[in-house]
Amino acid sequence: MPSSDRTNDECEIARIIHDSFGWALTKNRVLFESIFAKDDDFFTYYPDSKSTVVGWNQFEKFLKSWMDPRNKAIGFDIRNLRIVVSKTGEVAWFSAIVDDEGEFDGKPWGLKDVRWTGVLEKRGGSWKICQQHMSEANDEGSK
């Protein structure tokens, strides 16, 4: 894969990664649906064990609470983003640190310094997030 193609893919992937949080600022459902693979084996591990998602249908159920007018995304920050595109140019993986904040019915919610990794696949010329994993560092065990 030529380096210019790789650079273009990395820029596109970075945009998709940012849009995977940014869509919520305007509740842009069309953008949300364009980002993720609508597969039965799509999965997401969130920091809490109760929110593990397997399959697009289960993931889409989260939209109900995300689209609720009482839920308001306030902002997000993605930093230390690393993207690697495979030699074939069909698969990519990433890692980053994320902050995400909002409020539901006036009560704040959010993530701070969450580690985020994921895998994307190029399908029909478009990159889709196929899996993602978010976790909080636990440095207590290393003391």
Regions found by a protein language model. Give the residues of each.
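Short beta-strand edge/turn micro-motifs at domain boundaries
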Residues: 93, 111-143
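Hydrophobic/aromatic beta-strand elements that line small-molecule binding cavities or substrate pockets
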Residues: 20, 59, 63, 78-84, ...
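Short, cysteine-centered beta-strand-loop-beta hairpins and adjacent loop/turn segments enriched
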Residues: 100-110
